[in-house]
Structures are given as structure tokens and as C-alpha cells.
Amino acid sequence: MGSVLLDCAHRAAVPAGGALAVDRVTFSELVEAEVAARPNIEVVHGEVTQIPEGHVVIAAGPLCSPALSEEVMKLVGGDALAFMDAAAPIVDASTLDMDVLFSQSRYEEQGSGDYLNAPLNKEEYEAFIEALTTADRVVLKDFEGGDLFQACQPAEEVARTGKDAIRFGAMKPVGLTDPRTGRRPWAAIQLRAENKEKTAYNLVGFQTNLTFGEQKR
């Protein structure tokens, strides 16, 4: 297809089974370099407070400044804007207990694959769900709406919809075998490398609005 972004993504790719996942720092640097190298693109560093005339693509973020927000609201109306923040927990690889975790991508041989898996039995899962749904969350700011994008909800919100909801989502155990028991676990948390050095891991599907203190717990 000749996509520059896809080329950058493949160059910044980290092991993720059949998915395309990237080292976010490397990917950002590659995209920035590509943009800066284009002779037909002028890069201007500074705050935009007014929307220019003509055809414009506005991609402000992660949080739009008040001045630009007001300009956008003049065009689309204040009720059309929403903001919801969610953090994606990243775990230091040195803190992982490799006596419990096992390496396997779904439906592949044990010991193979690009994911680490933390297996949970029924009792561990239920205790985890109880802790997840009762943990302290970040208090929403006045500009943050409560309407959530259904396909990318915080893990605690998914868990609140039913005790087994997340077990059929981010924590589904299908295609996995716990080498300690030789059986499929009741549930599992998958971890994917954040970088090629594998010094940090991302909890797959665990975007959250919990406070940082609760995330550490």
C-alpha cells in the first residue's frame, strides 16, 4: 500500500503474535522524523489558539488546551466534545515472577509465543475482580464525560457489568495451558513486551481509570 505509517510501525514492531504492536517511543521518533523530512510539510512548534481558514485537520491531544477547545466548540457546539482519560499499566520486567508466569500465545505450543501469561484459578479470579471493582478511581474532572467508548472501556468498568465479563474478554483463558496443572486456567492476564529489549511489559486489555496507588496494589 505504500503507507509511511505502516512502514514505521513495522520498523518499530515488538513481538505480539499475529498482532502488530510497536515500541511506542521508537514509533513516535520514526514518525516525527518522516514528517520533518517531507519538503511539503512545515513543522511549527507552538500552541495553536485559533483555527486557520480553509481545510484543516484538528488533532489536539492528549488534552486540548482551553483556548483551542473554545474555538472547536464554536464550530461544533460544546455538547459534542468529550474527554476520558485511561492509563495503560506497564510493568517492570524485573518485578515479574517467572515461576508463575508462562510463555505461550493462544493455541500455540507451551513455551512458544510472544506473550507471558499469569494464570488464575477461580478463587484467585474472584478475589481479583472484587479488588478491581472496589478500588479507588481517579475523580473525573468537570470536563470529563461519563459516556465511554464501548469497544475500549476501562477494565474495572467491564468487570462491573458482570463477574465473568472480563473472563470472556481480556482475561479469557482459551487456547492456554498452565504448565503447573496441565489444564486451561480459569482466567489469565496476558502481558506483551513494550520494547524489543523486553525490559517492560504491557497488561493486554487493561486500560484503567484506577489511581496509581491502586494500580501498584
Mark where each language-model region is:
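Predominantly flavin-linked oxidoreductase catalytic cores and closely associated redox partners
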Residues: 25, 29, 34-215
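A conserved beta-strand/loop capping segment in the N-terminal third of enzymes
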Residues: 1-32, 36-40
